[in-house]
A protein has these predicted regions:
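Short helix-initiation/N-cap motifs at beta->coil->alpha
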Residues: 55-69
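Beta->alpha turn/N-cap motifs
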Residues: 61, 78-83, 113-115
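Long, aromatic- and glycine/proline-rich binding clefts that accommodate carbohydrate-like moieties
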Residues: 98, 152-206
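Paired acidic/hydrophobic, glycine-rich loop segments that form the ligand-binding mouth/hinge
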Residues: 74-79, 96
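Extracytoplasmic/periplasmic substrate-recognition and gating elements
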Residues: 49, 88-156
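Glycine-centered hinge/linker elements that transmit conformational signals in sensory
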Residues: 26-57
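Extracytoplasmic/periplasmic solute-binding protein
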Residues: 1-30, 44, 73
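Pocket-flanking alpha-helical
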Residues: 10, 63-67, 82-90
Length: 228
C-alpha cells in the first residue's frame, strides 16, 4: 500500500526492517540515509519484478486484505483485527501470523499505533484534590483486569497492561501471536512538528519512484525540504 491512505506505513516497514527509518539515533530527520535508499529501491524492485499487487499506488490496505482473503495475495502485512475482517467478509483462508521479514543483521520491526487516554492537571483549580481522586477512581475502574480485557476484545485493540495481555493470550491463540509482536514495535515520530510534511513527502517519494524517478534524488530532495 503506497497510496495516500497508508503509504507512510509501507515506507516504515521497508526502512525499519533494513536498519533505517525516519530519524537517526539523535531523533534528527534521516530520510535519505543509505539504509532508506536501499530499502526503497528494494521495495520498488519487488513491484517492477511482479512480486506484489499490480497497482500499489492505488490499491489500499483494504484492497490487499480482500485480495489476501480471496487467495490472490500469498503474504501481506496486516493489522491485529485481520481475523475479524476476514471472518466478516466471508473469507476462508488458511494462514499463520509471523514476524515481518528483515534484512540480514537487522531486527524485525512492526508498526505500533498508540491511542492515549489522558487527563490534565489544573494547578489553579481549588478542587484539584477531589478531581485527582475521581480520576484515580475512573482509571482503577477502567483498568480492572477483566473489564479492560473485555474492552480490548470489543474494540479489537491490543492491551497496555501485562496482566490483560496474559489473560488475552491465555484465552485466544490469535491474541497471543499479536501480543508477542508488540515487543518489536516502532512508532511514527508524530510528535515532531514536521511530521505531517514528512508523512506526505515519503508517500510522494514512493509514488514518484514507482513512475521511474531516482530514489536517492527523491529522498535527498525530501531531506533538504524537511531538515534544510
Amino acid at each position: 500500500d503506497m497510496t495516500t491512505d497508508e503509504g507512510q506505513a509501507a515506507f516504515s516497514y521497508y526502512t525499519w526492517n533494513n536498519g533505517g527509518g525516519f530519524v537517526d539515533e539523535n531523533n534528527d530527520w534521516a530520510l535519505n540515509s543509505d539504509a532508506n535508499v536501499e530499502a526503497l529501491n528494494y521495495a520498488i524492485g519487488l513491484v517492477n519484478d511482479g512480486y506484489t499487487n499490480s497497482d500499489p499506488a492505488n490499491e489500499t490496505r483494504y484492497d490487499l486484505q480482500d485480495m489476501f482473503g480471496a487467495g490472490k495475495v500469498a503474504m501481506m502485512i496486516g493489522p491485529n483485527n485481520i481475523p475479524t475482517y476476514l471472518s466478516d467478509g466471508g473469507y476462508e483462508v488458511n494462514y499463520e501470523v509471523a514476524s515481518i521479514p528483515s534484512n540480514e543483521g537487522c531486527d524485525s520491526v512492526a508498526m505500533g499505533v498508540c491511542d492515549r487516554l489522558e487527563v490534565f492537571k489544573d494547578d489553579a483549580a481549588e478542587d484539584q484534590e477531589a478531581r485527582t481522586a475521581a480520576i484515580t477512581k475512573f482509571f482503577d475502574f477502567f483498568y480492572d483486569d477483566s473489564r479492560y480485557s473485555d474492552y480490548m476484545i470489543y474494540e479489537g485493540f491490543l492491551p497496555t497492561t501485562q496482566t490483560a495481555a496474559d489473560l488475552l493470550a491465555k484465552d485466544d491463540e490469535t491474541f497471543a501471536s499479536w501480543i508477542d509482536i508488540l515487543q518489536s514495535c516502532n512508532f511514527y515520530p508524530a510528535t515532531k512538528t514536521e511530521w505531517a510534511d514528512v508523512k506526505q513527502g515519503v508517500i510522494e517519494v514512493e509514488q514518484n519512484a514507482l513512475l521511474g524517478d531516482d530514489v536517492q534524488t527523491l529522498l535527498d530532495d525530501l531531506q533538504a525540504d524537511i531538515a534544510g
